[in-house]
């Protein structure tokens, strides 16, 4: 009996000691970061292309970024928002519904905006995904019907924020911080949106959606020599142009602390 008690006590002490061992385990080795050097080339129109082959997964991603200087939209604030909404609604070559159906069929993800585009999907569809992205970006289909729809959506979105203190405060904050004449301080309103016409959107696209300051980054399970041929074929026709480089004075600090109030009905 005495021997059994001694054994039980020893087991109890061992378990208790192990349970109280809260020392931090030794860290494992740091993961190795392997940053591959991209293959780069530039098209005659100024588009800069960076390609990184990564064969770990059968996927590919494309990112088109247009690095233009900021610009003021003035009394037509909202023209860039509407340009973003209209790019990608099909193309002059493919109707909107057919375009979207093919993107879904490929299981791809393609997005467009006023300063570029992005796409991703399975590498076996790499060429077709790039074709669709290039088509939507370079040959946008700007129609009055789609313009009116997107314009109404933008105005409706503003109306839903009219009683949101945080939303209004955020917009007013930019005006106070940068000034209403600075690109970062312009105030979007229903009035400025209504000032925008379809021709304004087309002009905005022609002026700022240009290849001179554009970068196309391609990463995935592709071969550089093959993707280069596709890029040259698809983006070569993009008309060479440079966006205007406007300059603005830097915002100045106020001379003394100010408290600004916005009268909210609620």
Identify the meaning behind each predicted range.
Residues 9-18:
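Hydrophobic h-region of N-terminal signal peptides that target proteins for export
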Residues 90-93, 121-151:
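M16/insulysin-pitrilysin zinc metalloprotease superfamily fold
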Residues 1-4:
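Positively charged n-region of N-terminal signal peptides that target proteins for export
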């Amino acid at each position: 009996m005495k021997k059994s008690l001694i054994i039980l006590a020893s087991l109890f002490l061992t378990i208790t000691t192990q349970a109280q061992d809260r020392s931090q385990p030794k860290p494992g080795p740091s993961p190795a970061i392997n940053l591959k050097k991209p293959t780069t080339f530039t098209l005659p129109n100024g588009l800069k292309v960076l390609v990184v082959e990564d064969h770990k997964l059968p996927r590919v991603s494309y990112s088109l970024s247009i690095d233009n200087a900021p610009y003021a939209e003035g009394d037509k604030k909202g023209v860039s928002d509407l340009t973003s909404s209209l790019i990608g609604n099909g193309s002059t070559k493919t109707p909107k519904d057919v375009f979207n159906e093919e993107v879904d069929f490929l299981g791809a993800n393609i997005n467009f905006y006023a300063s570029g585009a992005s796409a991703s999907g399975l590498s076996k569809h790499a060429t077709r995904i790039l074709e669709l992205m290039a088509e939507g970006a370079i040959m946008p289909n700007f129609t009055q019907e789609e313009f009116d729809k997107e314009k109404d959506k933008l105005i409706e979105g503003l109306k839903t924020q009219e009683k949101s203190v945080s939303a209004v405060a955020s917009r007013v904050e930019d005006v106070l911080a940068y000034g209403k004449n600075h690109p970062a301080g312009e105030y979007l309103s229903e009035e400025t949106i209504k000032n925008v016409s379809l021709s304004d959107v087309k002009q905005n696209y022609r002026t700022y959606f240009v290849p001179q300051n554009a970068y196309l980054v391609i990463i995935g399970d592709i071969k550089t020599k093959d993707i280069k041929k596709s890029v040259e074929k698809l983006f070569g026709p993009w008309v060479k142009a440079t966006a205007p480089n406007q300059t603005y004075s830097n915002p100045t600090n106020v001379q003394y602390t100010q408290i600004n109030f916005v009268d909210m009905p609620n």
